[in-house]
Amino acid sequence: MKITESGFDIQGVLDLLPHRYPFLLIDRVIETNSKDSLHAIKNVTFNEPMFNGHFPAKPIFPGVLLLEAIAQACGLLGFKITESKKNANDLYLFAGIDNARFKRQVIPGDTVDFFVTFEKERRGIWKFTGRAEVDGDVACTAEIICARREV
């Protein structure tokens, strides 16, 4: 049985990620295992700016933003694994994506659960697997590659 730690609210997310509105895509971390996994959520509302154009008559949360949210969750997990805090010059940069698949649409009113798992790290390159779910149904899966760098 893995020992888990409690999650943290939006202030904890803001303390670790450099992203801000409208590009901060994680609302809360539900649970972390500081060794290898994290569960976060995003509440999707009709007031999100992307729905002005994607698509006005039938709003659908863009799949590429689901991938970005998974990457943000991976960054949060990276900071938790290393037990470090964000500083102005330290970022997890999106370095690559493999095997991205979209299974269902995400629409206003949905709560998206993001589950990310650390796979390996080599020479500053981190690999994670992630999935987005709505009501237990998989919306998106991907392998995310990040590089922690001082910028």
UniProtKB/Swiss-Prot annotation:
CDD domains: FabZ (cd01288). One of its GO terms (biological process) is lipid A biosynthetic process. It is found in: Cytoplasm. InterPro entries: FabA_FabZ, FabZ, HotDog_dom_sf. It is an enzyme of class 4 (lyase). Its EC number is 4.2.1.59. Gene3D superfamilies: Hotdog Thioesterase. Transmembrane segments: none annotated. GO terms for cellular component: cytoplasm; membrane. It catalyses: a (3R)-hydroxyacyl-[ACP] = a (2E)-enoyl-[ACP] + H2O. Its main location: cytoplasm. Pfam families: FabA. The active site is at residue 54. GO terms for molecular function: (3R)-hydroxyacyl-[acyl-carrier-protein] dehydratase activity. Keywords: Cytoplasm, Lipid A biosynthesis, Lipid biosynthesis, Lipid metabolism, Lyase. Involved in unsaturated fatty acids biosynthesis. Catalyzes the dehydration of short chain beta-hydroxyacyl-ACPs and long chain saturated and unsaturated beta-hydroxyacyl-ACPs. NCBIfam families: fabZ (TIGR01750), PRK00006.1 (NF000582). Belongs to the thioester dehydratase family. FabZ subfamily. This is 3-hydroxyacyl-[acyl-carrier-protein] dehydratase FabZ. It comes from Idiomarina loihiensis (strain ATCC BAA-735 / DSM 15497 / L2-TR). The lineage of its organism: Bacteria, Pseudomonadati, Pseudomonadota, Gammaproteobacteria, Alteromonadales.
